[in-house]
Amino acid sequence: MQRIQLAEDLQFSRVIHGLWRLNEWNYSDAELLSLIEWCIDHGITTFDHADIYGGYTCEKLFGNALALSPGLRENIELVTKCGIVLESPERPAHRSHHYNTSKSHILASVEQSLMNLRTDYIDMLLIHRPDPLMDPEGVAEAFQALKCSGKVRYFGVSNFKDHQYRMLESYLPEKLVTNQIELSAYELENMLDGTLNLCQEKRIPPMAWSPLAGGKVFTENTDKDRRVRTALESVQGEIGAASLDEVMYAWLYTHPAGIMPIVGSGKRERISAAINALSYKLDQDQWFRIFTAVQGYDIP
């Protein structure tokens, strides 16, 4: 498994396991532990969480499984996010869906995540979404307090556009080390609007959520779906990939930004597709055939 350097003493596995839908997998603690161990055995050591996943339940489910084998903690990297507030039975005091990136909320969210995940520290904390009411000085104070206490090692953001990223980072004593963005061989917005360019400018490898675009290309039948599917099938035959999943992952891996896809499945065979795709590299012709199919028109 390739390793991606994010900071001097922090590496992530190229493939990241996402726990967004963990509560829907209906795994026992022992079954989830088995999946975590399988991931580690196959080189996947980075696990992506958020406080709100599963209506505030997924972190706790993961922590319960990890508690069965506490020694595994030193072999993995934990990512979590905060800043979104949801109405939920798990949070009866919440009255509406809104953002909260205040210093007090960030600190309280991290304390809860540490308890949920059964750990003393988080490797990476991300601000989940840009907050139009964000006080960047308060965020900086929260990050500094968490860093000094050893509760969070590094910080990043999620879904930030380039101007939002630059604004927040300008207040921080240390640079952000990733931006988790939607990116796939189906959704190109962040590749075309400067967001991915900023990651390259800053030398920060991005994390990519929804790298298979939620499966739309496999299940829907719009003009775009048919175009992209045809291009993927053409490249699949040329490189000998076992599935269209593998082609979509290989398309991301071919980009020089060091994109780390987040695989949000509890099925080993679906996770394996992201691993297997590391053995493929598309040439320019193959990569641009897919790119052009997604856009729906030829490049200039």
Curated annotation (Swiss-Prot):
Listed GO CC annotations: cytosol
Entry keyword annotation includes Oxidoreductase: yes
Residues annotated as signal peptide: none
Broad EC category: oxidoreductase
Keyword field: NADP, Oxidoreductase
Active site, UniProt feature: Y53
Residues noted as binding NADP(+) in the record, renumbered to the chain: S210, P211, L212, A213, G214, G215, K216, V217, F218, T219, E220
The name this protein goes by in its record: Uncharacterized oxidoreductase YcsN
Lineage of the species this protein comes from: Bacteria, Bacillati, Bacillota, Bacilli, Bacillales
Gene name of the encoded protein: ycsN
